[in-house]
Amino acid sequence: MLDVVEIQKILPHRYPFLLVDRVVELEKGKSVKAYKNVSISEPVFEGHFPGHPIYPGVMIIEGMAQAGGVLAFLSSSEEEQEAAKDKVVYFMSIDKAKFRNPVRPGDKLEYHLEVIKHRGSIWVLDGKAYVDGNLVAEAELKAMIVDK
């Protein structure tokens, strides 16, 4: 549905901090499914952990937040999307975060987010991350669309 070039038109993040490779499904105002291919060549693996590389949980949460940002922007009206060029999504809070299984280089990390609540510029999302259909992380995320 959206490749990395299209995602970069929405999100301000760039390598090495753009953590969404592709959006595969999006239902405006409701949900998004996206993924990241985790590669051993990512800088984070230089120190986390040498000889036993594990993708950091905070990076999984950030990837979910980025997928949620795409959902928030694309759920806006065309007029709001045009105005959104001067806006950015700020992460406000993380609640109920749990890390269930490790993510390793070579894994396809899938993000599934559903809208719990949306009021004005504030979004509350239920985020889950999977590898091979197994839950690896989950959290409730709150974000706000603000002026740059």
Swiss-Prot record:
InterPro entries: FabA_FabZ (IPR013114), FabZ (IPR010084), HotDog_dom_sf (IPR029069). Its EC number is 4.2.1.59. It catalyses: a (3R)-hydroxyacyl-[ACP] = a (2E)-enoyl-[ACP] + H2O. Disulfide bonds: none annotated. The active site is at residue 48. It is found in: Cytoplasm. One of its GO terms (molecular function) is (3R)-hydroxyacyl-[acyl-carrier-protein] dehydratase activity. SUPFAM superfamilies: Thioesterase/thiol ester dehydrase-isomerase. Involved in unsaturated fatty acids biosynthesis. Catalyzes the dehydration of short chain beta-hydroxyacyl-ACPs and long chain saturated and unsaturated beta-hydroxyacyl-ACPs. HAMAP family: FabZ. This is 3-hydroxyacyl-[acyl-carrier-protein] dehydratase FabZ. It comes from Nitratiruptor sp. (strain SB155-2). The gene is fabZ.
